[in-house]
């Protein structure tokens, strides 16, 4: 079992972010100890780490909350969860394409400067 501080270190989430996610219903403490401190198990750690990945892809808190609600309903919602993840994956591919276009624009400008062009455009 992990304290909130340990969970923070293991996932890279700030303690305040963990509490925020709890307030939004997308993360829950496994329980509380005698001093009323939150504690978390390994499943919660894995889920918190997955939340990090989802957020890094740009998924909103509300979409993660919807995904979590489906997750909590069990195996019958696997098709809907797959659809959500595929939609998010498509968004990531769009982000990659946009970044590749940005790299091409930078490369083009670098090549122009290296060839002696002084144009600003």
Regions found by a protein language model. Name each.
Residues 3-9, 28, 42-121:
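Arg/Lys-rich, alpha-helical DNA-contact motif
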Residues 4-7, 14-17, 34:
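Short glycine/proline-centered loop/turn elements that form peptide/ligand docking sites
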Residues 18-21, 51:
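Conserved hydrophobic/aromatic packing and binding residues within compact polymer-binding modules
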Residues 21, 34, 67:
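Residue-level "edge-of-site" marker
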Residues 25:
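Glycine-centered, phosphate/nucleic-acid-interacting loop/turn motifs that mediate DNA/RNA or nucleotide
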Residues 28-35:
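Beta-hairpin "wing" of winged helix-turn-helix
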Residues 35-42:
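Minor-groove-contacting beta-hairpin "wing" of winged helix-turn-helix DNA-binding domains
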